[in-house]
């Protein structure tokens, strides 16, 4: 029954919101439509022969198909999932994971940066500071949030509140989901590179636990500005890279259509980054991706946050800073090809 309701909701979403169906998802959606039609038929007629048995077979086939497809996604496919318009954003996770969240505004230099959302909240009754990118769901929100690409004011606001968290001994949890820092001329004039560098320099020295989670896109300096922490987590189908596949293809081959080749070369998936010791943990998503089940994705992330926060709280401030510095200093070690 739950599967029937899930399929029905998915079909209604497709019709109502015209959600994006990714190329590798088309067979999955076609099979879901077939199951939905058979379920509707079974409700109309009580005696339809072996229709119940057929539905059961198709449900098993659907589960296997989802598992096979999502277990073998390449870099570009993962990028498309990470950018999926229905993928849960920071505010969705706040709703499911935290309580008593209160958004604070302003960088105290005349700006706010709405691409960054930040404020205190409670995580299982523990006061924490939550900071993250917010892309926006519809076009109006996306424009207001600048598609998750923050101006310097957003990063300065984030730093102000992280320093507040340090003052009150509150752990910091950041949610990373951005194509990158806003690259406009006005952002550069306002000190974009300085704002990012100052955040990184300051976060490495903060004497409270910091957990960073890549929930969608982790784009270059825009991600690093709130991505220096004791533990770096990535959702299974998120990506983390110095540049987008399109940008990489345009620079290396002067052909943005070589995005698949670029995505593979960038090694931007969670599995790659765990292997390279850039991140510490992969948080598995519900079968079919987090965009299919926001609540279940949040439950899994909450469990991972609870485990990591419990471990970090046992470490003293001096040791936290020392371990964090060592963690980032050893990144990017040169190795011989083939070793």
Explain the meaning of each model-derived region.
Residues 1-15:
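Single conserved hydrophobic/aromatic residue that forms the stacking wall/gate
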Residues 31, 74, 130, 177, ...:
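Terminal peptide-recognition signature
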Residues 16-127, 295-339:
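Intrinsically disordered, low-complexity segments enriched in small/flexible residues
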Residues 176-306, 310, 314:
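Conserved catalytic cores of soluble enzyme domains
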Residues 79-82, 143-147, 288-291:
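Short hinge/gating elements
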Residues 7, 151-154, 266:
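Short, conserved glycine- and acidic-residue-centered signature motifs
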Residues 71, 100, 110-112, 118, ...:
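Glycine-rich beta-alpha loop segments
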